[in-house]
Amino acid sequence: MSYTSEARVERATIPMLQRWTQEGRRIVMTTAYDAVTARIADPIVDILLVGDSVGNVCLGFENTLPVSMAMMNHHLEAVARTKPRALLVADMPFLSFHLSPEETIRNAGGFLKRGADAVKLEGGTKRVEMVRALVNCEIPVMGHLGLTPQSVNAMGGFKVQGRKADDALRLLDDAHRLQEAGCFALVLEGIPAELAARATESLTIPTIGIGAGPRCSGQVLVFHDVLGLMEGHRPKFVRTYANGFQLLQEALSRWAADVRNGVFPTSQESYRLPEDLGETIANWAPSSPT
């Protein structure tokens, strides 16, 4: 069955997405960091992720490590105000789910109070305790395995994971442990396509790939990557569907030229005084200082 790009109308839910996976329908997820990106993407995708990637995409950081709960809350609230139909997932930033189950629950619960439908956290077996704690509090959790950006220092950079036998088998074990702990879906990032396919076929929950080949239950890309809004290095797994950076610069350049040439604004883009005030304004002079 093929699908068009027509807008989705019904509100996405976790059971719905899991049913789609059983039916063979692929899930589409992208990032949203503010109300504008949410309104553009929401009619089209199934999941909106308020990702901690906001740090390097929008806030100028080199990676996601400096992103705080306060920053994530700010961006989540902006997206949630649009009342999206897509499932709204918020990323747990670095050190927001590491110290204790109590703090993890408090932070994740704050996301749900601000409008998120679920949270996403990175890591495998080490995170099982936190996942169970959240699920026991009725907080839906999406897991994230493979190239986990918050582990960039431990991994020695943004490198493909799971290319060695031990690493590949560990990832498969981690995927099952996260499923058993209650995750409703898993992001698989930066791993060989064959490994992602094996994980997907062995799980009952959806997998959402990014740099993990075509045989996941769905795919996610950063909004700005899809639209070509980023300069510089583009990862191999990114397919860009527009040169948004150039298009926006060209539009701004045309506007700037119109301003400098005195052709913006015109009378059609200006407000007019009532006719009876024209003479009053024309005859105005500064009052003398007292």
PLM region descriptions:
Residues 2-242, 246-275, 279, 283-290:
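Alpha/beta enzyme core
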